[in-house]
Amino acid sequence: MSKLLKNTAYYGIVPAVPKVVSILLLPLLTMHLTSVDYGIAGTIVAYTTAIAAFSTLGCTAFITSSFYHYGSHYKIIWRQVYGFLQYWMVLFAILQSVLLYFIIPEEAIENRWLIIILANFNNVFFGPSAILGAMYYRLNQEPKPVVFRSLACGLITVFSNLIFIVYLESGYMGWYISSFLGTFCINASYWYVLNHRLGLKPSYILNLKAIKHVLKVSLPTIPHAYSTYLINGSNKFVMDRANTPLSAIGQFNFASEFMSYFELFASAVNSAISPMFMEELKRGNILASHRIFKQSLVFFSIAVCGFIIWSREIFLVMVRNEDLSSTYWIASILVAGFIHRPLYLAVTSAMFYYEKTASLMKISLTGGLIAFLGYCMCIPLWGITSAAIITYLSFLAIGYLGYVLPSTRKLYILPYKVWNIFIALHALLVVAFFIMQTPLYIIVIFSISILILLNKIRNNL
């Protein structure tokens, strides 16, 4: 438990500091941003994330598995992957530039070329270095080099937002400039470490047989990664195609920001759990893997229900924009789906360890298709609230499909029956949404009671 808490703290709490600062700055930032600004950013993101799954061709899956299966020789194959990604990133940048040229909204057309340059520069020159550098430290369970880089990048981005949005009144462009500055710093630092300190330089003479094996493992994960877009990004694409007002897209995009905070939390827990989980699978220690699963279940339940219960008060205090402050219900529905994430993390970790990435495609694509088809049918009729509900149902699907599909249900056996977990988590959500609508004093009393209860049972976690 202590190791999980320590690694989660490194991967989650430290990098979350910029997010916390960003949240604290919301009252100031939302005074200088409009729902149209959020709509412009949301529309562009909806299209760029449509191809983001192809940016690495899924090579991170092979990077992970090769670390465990190739022993001390993994760096040899990593150099091949490094060189291959250097070539690929140039082609991907060309593809993304063409896409951006045509889809940037009319309201942002004057900044078209600057947006294109800012969106592609870092990936072309430092993208592969950042991927391999972060994976090296993470797989060696050395979180500090990763998280403190993330902290520095985040703080640079947040305070750049303050300068460009609040003081220079740059509107939506403040996000793009700030993101470029922060990403440049972190990616360039990985390039130096990877090439000079670790001596892991790219091999530009590619071994086609080796690359073919890399792609055999990696390409099936693209639908898995693409499902993230279908769930999180295609909703704004459908809104745009359905001629949803840009201000409404902006409201949904703002609510989605809180979902992105939970994505950071989920990524942190995954970064902490996955190496530990795979290590226990390697040892054949099922009881230890069950303990890790239970701990993650508690983490996510507390975080999700806590946000839902306090969302109304958070938006009331932090959001100084009437159009945006009313979206706390949408944000709560979007965040609710994360309560099922531990089930997904457990079965996908087993898939990556056993290199069963083809099975992962079934789960991811199913969840993604449920989302996309649901958006297409519901958004034109019922608007942005229906998009949030469909997102929740998609998270629900990918959380449980791995335990019901014949090809994957035996990869990892849960410590409890799946149906019991399903009922218990939904009971928690019902209580959380009920408490959210009660007066503040009831919310405070309920929260204190839960904290006291957790303190009593923490030794059993």
Regions found by a protein language model. Give the residues of each.
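Interhelical loop/hinge segments that connect adjacent transmembrane helices in multipass membrane
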Residues: 1-4, 112, 144, 168, ...
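Membrane-water interface segments that mark the loop-to-transmembrane alpha-helix transition
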Residues: 6-18, 44, 49, 53-104, ...
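Transmembrane helical elements of multi-pass membrane transporters/channels
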Residues: 7-22, 153, 175-190, 194, ...
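Membrane-interface junctions at transmembrane-helix termini in multi-pass inner-membrane proteins
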Residues: 125-148, 335-366
